[in-house]
């Protein structure tokens, strides 16, 4: 195991435009960090640079205190789990898991011991004699993980390993990856576009956007205190409601552009540096708009209501803005019904319209 450090890491393919812009992060020994973001944000490129599959244009990558910028992937003491499993179809599960060690010249007895140990961790013992075509998608992914485990690397790298699995299997594999990390405590970097994977697996999340690390923090902090409107809209399902408007001079009301006036008394309170009498983007998550006793209330004309099982999601509009409100299962307003919604001051977020950055 080893710490992983990225200092001012930048990437350019043509020497003119950068696809990664000065990534700085220190990942502790044994920490599980998730790179999350939409397609084209640079997360997979950054992972490939850590692995040695892409060159570093500027900056420094160090594993265990050793700078690895110029080292080949095989010399970095890393193991990678891919989206597409990359199993040899003519080999058994045991042969697939041990092949990397075999081509490195590791003794057969040690290979067998490591394969058996990994198979026990991943519950693959009864499958060791099978070939990939005889396995389910989840089993194949466990074999791919086992192949990485037998390497006993300093760092695990996961490149969207669950993307090919159905929803039920993704949940199962998330739990298995959590258990695996709890048992091995190996430094891990995991790439995904799925925010649920990011929130459930990570000790820290790096939210990527257009080649920048938009926010780095614990999942709960990223969710509760998004640094920018991008993070607020990307993390959370459904996304945070973001409303453009103007805070009144006394700070007690928020006038939505082409929409209603909302009561927000106390939201711009002491220490939040939210100036009244100017334009802001007001953010509030759907689950915080459920009517509660004592909360400031507004009204929303319901356009539709989605039944999600444990709860419901009501939709409407304030001016040009689509608004979603999460409701308990027993509340299912009909189309056209007027719904009272809460705007609790402690759950209101203000963002600068010019920069998109969080205030206070």
UniProtKB/Swiss-Prot annotation:
InterPro entries: AAA+_ATPase, ABC_transporter-like_ATP-bd, ABC_transporter-like_CS, ABC_transpr_MalK-like, ABC_transpr_MalK/UgpC-like, Mo/tungstate-bd_C_term_dom, NA-bd_OB-fold, OB_MalK-like. It is found in: Cell inner membrane. ATP binds at residues 37-44. Signal peptide: none annotated. It is an enzyme of class 7 (translocase). Keywords: ATP-binding, Cell inner membrane, Cell membrane, Membrane, Nucleotide-binding, Sugar transport, Translocase, Transport. CDD domains: ABC_MalK_N. One of its GO terms (molecular function) is ATP binding. Belongs to the ABC transporter superfamily. sn-glycerol-3-phosphate importer (TC 3.A.1.1.3) family. This is sn-glycerol-3-phosphate import ATP-binding protein UgpC. It comes from Burkholderia thailandensis (strain ATCC 700388 / DSM 13276 / CCUG 48851 / CIP 106301 / E264).
């Amino acid at each position: 195991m080893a710490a992983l450090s990225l200092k001012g890491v930048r990437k350019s393919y043509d020497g003119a435009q950068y696809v990664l812009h000065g990534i700085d992060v220190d990942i502790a020994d044994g920490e599980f960090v998730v790179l999350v973001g939409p397609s084209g944000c640079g997360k997979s490129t950054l992972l490939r640079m850590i692995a040695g599959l892409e060159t570093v244009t500027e900056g420094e990558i160090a594993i265990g205190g050793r700078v690895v910028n110029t080292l080949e992937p095989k010399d970095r003491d890393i193991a990678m789990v891919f989206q597409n499993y990359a199993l040899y179809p003519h080999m058994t599960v045991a042969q697939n898991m041990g092949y990397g060690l075999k081509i490195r010249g590791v003794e057969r007895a040690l290979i067998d011991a490591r394969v058996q140990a990994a198979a026990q961790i991943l519950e693959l013992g009864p499958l060791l004699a099978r070939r990939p075509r005889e396995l389910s998608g989840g089993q194949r992914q466990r074999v791919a993980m086992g192949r990485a485990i037998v390497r006993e690397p300093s760092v695990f790298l996961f490149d969207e390993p669950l993307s090919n699995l159905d929803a039920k299997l993704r949940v199962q594999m998330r739990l298995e990856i959590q258990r695996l990390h709890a048992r091995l405590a190996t430094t891990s970097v995991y790439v995904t576009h799925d925010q649920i994977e990011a929130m459930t697996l990570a000790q820290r999340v790096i939210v990527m956007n257009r080649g920048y690390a938009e926010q780095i923090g614990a999942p709960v902090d990223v969710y509760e205190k998004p640094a920018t409107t991008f993070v607020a809209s990307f993390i959370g399902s459904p996304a945070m409601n973001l409303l453009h408007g103007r805070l009144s001079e006394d700070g007690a009301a928020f006038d939505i552009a082409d929409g209603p006036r909302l009561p927000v008394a106390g939201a711009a309170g002491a220490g939040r540096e939210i100036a009244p009498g100017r334009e802001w983007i007001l953010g509030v998550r759907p689950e915080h708009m459920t009517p509660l006793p004592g909360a400031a209330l507004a009204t929303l004309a319901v356009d539709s209501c989605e039944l999600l099982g444990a709860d419901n999601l009501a939709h409407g509009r304030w001016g040009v803005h689509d608004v979603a409100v999460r409701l308990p299962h027993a509340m299912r307003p009909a189309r056209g019904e007027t719904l009272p919604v809460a705007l609790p001051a402690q759950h209101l977020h203000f963002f600068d319209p010019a920069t998109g950055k969080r205030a206070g």
